[in-house]
Swiss-Prot record:
Name of protein: Putative HMP/thiamine-binding protein YkoF
Recorded GO MF terms: thiamine binding
Coiled-coil ranges (or none): none
UniProt cross-references to InterPro entries, sorted A to Z: HMP/thiamine-bd (IPR015835), MTH1187/YkoF-like (IPR029756), Thiamin/HMP-bd_put_YkoF (IPR011522)
Function of the protein: Part of the ABC transporter complex YkoCDEF that could transport hydroxymethylpyrimidine (HMP) and/or thiamine. Could also transport other HMP-containing products. Binds thiamine via its HMP moiety.
Subunit structure: Homodimer in vitro. In vivo, may be a part of an ABC transporter complex which is composed of two ATP-binding proteins (YkoD), two transmembrane proteins (YkoC and YkoE) and a solute-binding protein (YkoF).
Gene3D superfamilies: 3.30.70.930
Length: 200
């Protein structure tokens, strides 16, 4: 496969889903099965799942998987990395659909889930990386999802639709200004400790 040295606009998301239940296999399989992945290339192995395609379709599928898993009402965590423009990437193992219709949006629009999140943006080989990170924080503040800076990350909170909208806006802003972007995300839903804190 041909190496394309940072010029690829193939976006990717490699993630692992962790349902905190003995029935974790069915929660994972159900979330993946309910999500329409016809617009992305996807593969699941014994460690993680990867989605590859356009930014539109990668974020569409990622949000749908999270929402379906969270609506199991089990405590779930999604941990993953979005990336675009990796110098070591190839043109293989992808599906860049010509259509921009988000194939999961109608199905998940009515699904609700909390999405407390910690994310970190890494503009690779970018001298003004802190400038881009501060732009990311400003986007989150403007969208009403920013909570605070924490060690090695920024914390977001809100409905999953809003949080994923912020993450996508940050990713798009950064990829328009530098070639290679990675962004790590850690999201949680239905955490017992969070419920106890709210009740207390």
């Amino acid at each position: 496969m041909e190496h394309i040295c940072g010029t690829s606009r193939i976006a990717g998301f490699r993630f692992s889903l962790y349902p905190m239940t003995d029935d974790f296999i069915s929660v994972i399989k159900s979330a993946l099965k309910k999500t329409d992945t016809s617009k992305v290339w996807t593969k699941t192995d014994h460690i993680s799942t990867v989605l590859r395609g356009s930014i539109d379709h990668v974020f569409d599928a990622a949000k749908a998987i999270y929402l379906h898993a969270a609506n199991s009402e089990q405590h779930i965590v999604m941990n993953g990395t979005f990336s675009i423009g990796c110098p070591g990437d190839t043109q293989g193992d992808t599906y860049l659909s010509k259509g921009d219709k988000r194939v999961n949006e109608d199905a998940v629009r009515g699904l609700k889930a909390e999405a407390p999140c910690q994310f970190a943006l890494y503009p690779m080989n970018e001298p003004d990386y802190m400038g881009l990170i501060m732009e990311a924080v400003d986007i989150a503040k403007a969208q009403g999802t920013f909570v605070q800076g924490v060690h090695y990350a920024s914390e977001l909170d809100g409905d999953a639709h809003d949080v994923f909208s912020t993450l996508e806006a940050v990713f798009r802003m950064a990829e328009q200004q530098t070639n290679h972007i990675t962004m790590t995300v850690n999201l949680s839903a239905n955490s017992p400790s969070r419920k106890n804190r709210k009740q207390g």
